[in-house]
């Protein structure tokens, strides 16, 4: 029997029988145990020891930066081989090669494969199934893209991790965490790589890839200690929206999850809050969580729910991914399947002129409050194209609404468009189920391009309650489009009451918001690093500052935010940040887990090789002390201002 196989069998045999409240998947029963570590040679045991048993070797924790592959104290090839042998499968440890390496001179260059890859490069599925790719490639450092998209001259790892563990068991995750912590290696977590800031990448890191933890269990009547009794679904960390929605539909229920097909629901999405086509009906995805299974920074596998690790449970529901631990599964509430009516329409300025075009857009803005008061969700874009502009609704999504009810909601807007002589050809469809509607109506979201940065803002209901407020907010959005920037927007209202009045870490700005708006800034693909930095700063301090100015005291959605967001602690969590920081210090005082703009990330920074904000560089400490950070956070507990109109 091989060493890794014996460790799996021993760990499984030593696991106690779980209580009814802790139903574990098979892969969660395969765990690393102290009993097994005690059988290893001392040198090997030290590599994989749990935190409370580990005595740091000299200088292992004294360095300013996490060790990098060209450092003398980077783990030896022998150490990496030992890690690979301990994992639950012989191929679990991956030394990654970028997909686009087939396009560059080298041993795997293949022009046919390069052509095929390039043709499918913007398809998100191309990147989701890869252990290292992310959907915001600008944060990888652009060191290996297909040359016709971005020619880097050669192909290097850049911001991709040096090693990846294809996690198939809790054992794999525990070994990865312990190895990285004990050897001073940067650790990152990748599920699907959707995060707008590139949190799933990291040069010189060991990455834990949770994408293949796909188990799903349905409970017809789940009895939770929180008082909830009803249907529920437990899903592995790697389960994506298209898989979760299908499983729910098969059992006649719906769950609160993302609109994007490829989003890894139980990873950073739900930990960051998670907005949904059902948010105006059932709140944020995080509001519907009943419990997490998680491996913490010490290597311990534990539960976080209403009765166990309650502080961690609070933090994981909205506090963000990549910083508190590695979630292996999540149990969420489910609701009865429902019919949905959806509508789509579009118009542009080509034949009607910009004045009438903007009057048509404003006509929809005037109905924001009415729409969300009826539990609807609108997903629309406003796109400049040269001298013209296009408004596209795809879709207006009305859960549990008949065709007539949805039509009546939209008729005032459509009547205004008719009065303005703006022609539209709306498509209005009633579906028998949420799943059918979601499949038919939401487009597949592509990978972002290589010369764009995004930012977002939550616009509160108060901004749209008066004519003056609507004018101010609409003006800020219009100015961005007139400056050449696309707007991607969501009209929804995940109010606290909609989510069942939970106490969790979700950004309080969400509770008063009825518009989540995203925009981006492009630059020339051949721009120098200095020009890119100038464009980024202009975007952050220009367009996004105008949005902040008209929404004082509000915030931004951390999963879809500007990486350079100023005062991000307040923007992502408001007055909840001080509590989150305390929980981070309690569960991960050594910052084993780090991600940009994550809770507790202030003490570290990526020193990128090109000086740009990306993951292509060493992770190093900065001079700011925790006490300084904490005192600044306390100031955030004071009430924040609102726009008075």
Language model region names:
Residues 1-23, 645:
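Fungal secretory targeting signals
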């Amino acid at each position: 029997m091989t060493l890794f196989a014996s460790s799996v069998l021993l760990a499984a045999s030593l696991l106690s029988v779980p209580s009814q409240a802790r139903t574990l998947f098979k892969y969660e029963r395969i765990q690393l145990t102290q009993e097994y570590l005690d059988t290893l040679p001392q040198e090997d045991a030290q590599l994989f020891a749990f935190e409370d048993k580990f005595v740091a070797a000299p200088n292992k924790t004294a360095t300013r930066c996490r060790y990098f592959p060209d450092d003398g104290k980077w783990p030896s090839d022998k150490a990496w081989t030992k890690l690979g042998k301990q994992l639950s499968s012989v191929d679990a440890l991956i030394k990654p090669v970028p997909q686009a390496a087939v396009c560059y001179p080298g041993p795997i260059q293949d022009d046919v494969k390069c052509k095929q890859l390039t043709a499918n490069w913007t398809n998100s599925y191309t990147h989701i199934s890869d252990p290292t790719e992310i959907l915001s490639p600008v944060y990888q450092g652009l060191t290996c893209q297909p040359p016709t998209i971005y020619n880097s001259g050669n192909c290097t790892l850049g911001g991709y991790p040096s090693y990846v563990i294809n996690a198939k068991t809790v054992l794999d995750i525990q070994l990865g965490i312990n190895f990285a912590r004990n050897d001073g290696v940067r650790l990152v977590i990748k599920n699907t790589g959707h995060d707008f800031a590139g949190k799933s990448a990291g040069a010189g890191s060991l990455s834990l890839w949770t994408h293949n933890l796909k188990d799903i269990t349905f409970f017809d009547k789940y009895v939770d200690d929180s008082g909830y009794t009803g249907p529920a679904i437990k899903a592995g960390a790697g389960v994506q929206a298209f898989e979760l929605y299908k499983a729910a539909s098969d059992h006649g229920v719906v769950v609160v999850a993302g609109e994007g097909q490829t989003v890894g629901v139980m990873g950073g999405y739900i930990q960051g809050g998670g907005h949904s086509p059902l948010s105006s009906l059932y709140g944020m995805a995080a509001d519907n969580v009943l419990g997490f299974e998680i491996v913490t920074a010490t290597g311990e596998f534990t539960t976080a729910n209403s009765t166990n690790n309650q502080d961690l449970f609070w933090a994981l529901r909205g506090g963000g991914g990549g910083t508190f631990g590695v979630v292996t599964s999540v149990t969420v509430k489910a609701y009865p399947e429902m019919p949905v009516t959806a509508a789509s329409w579009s118009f542009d300025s080509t034949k009607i002129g910009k004045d009438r075009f903007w009057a048509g857009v404003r006509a929809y803005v005037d109905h924001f409050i009415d729409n969300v008061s009826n539990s609807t969700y609108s997903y629309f874009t406003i796109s400049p194209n040269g001298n013209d502009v296009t408004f596209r609704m795809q879709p207006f999504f009305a859960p549990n609404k008949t065709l007539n009810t949805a039509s009546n909601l939209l008729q005032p807007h459509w009547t205004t468009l008719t009065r303005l002589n703006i022609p539209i050809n709306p498509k209005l469809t009633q579906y028998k189920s949420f799943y059918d509607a979601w499949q038919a109506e939401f487009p597949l979201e592509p990978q972002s391009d290589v010369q764009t940065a995004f930012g977002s803002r939550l616009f509160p209901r108060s901004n749209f309650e008066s004519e003056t407020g609507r004018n101010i907010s609409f003006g800020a959005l219009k100015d961005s489009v007139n400056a050449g920037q696309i707007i991607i927007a969501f009209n929804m209202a995940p109010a606290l009451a909609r989510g069942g009045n939970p106490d969790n870490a979700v950004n309080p700005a969400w509770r008063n918001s009825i518009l989540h708006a995203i925009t981006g800034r492009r630059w020339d693909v051949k721009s120098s690093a200095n020009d890119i930095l100038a464009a980024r700063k202009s975007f952050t301090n220009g367009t996004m500052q105008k949005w902040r100015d008209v929404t004082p005291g509000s915030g931004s959605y951390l999963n879809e935010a500007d990486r350079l967001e100023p005062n991000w602690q307040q923007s992502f969590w408001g007055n909840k940040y001080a509590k989150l920081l305390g929980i981070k210090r309690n569960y991960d005082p050594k910052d084993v887990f780090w991600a940009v703009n994550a809770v507790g990330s202030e003490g570290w920074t990526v020193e990128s090789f090109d000086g740009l904000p990306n993951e292509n560089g060493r992770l190093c400490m900065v001079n700011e002390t925790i006490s300084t950070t904490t005192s600044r956070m306390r100031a955030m507990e004071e009430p924040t201002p609102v726009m008075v109109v």
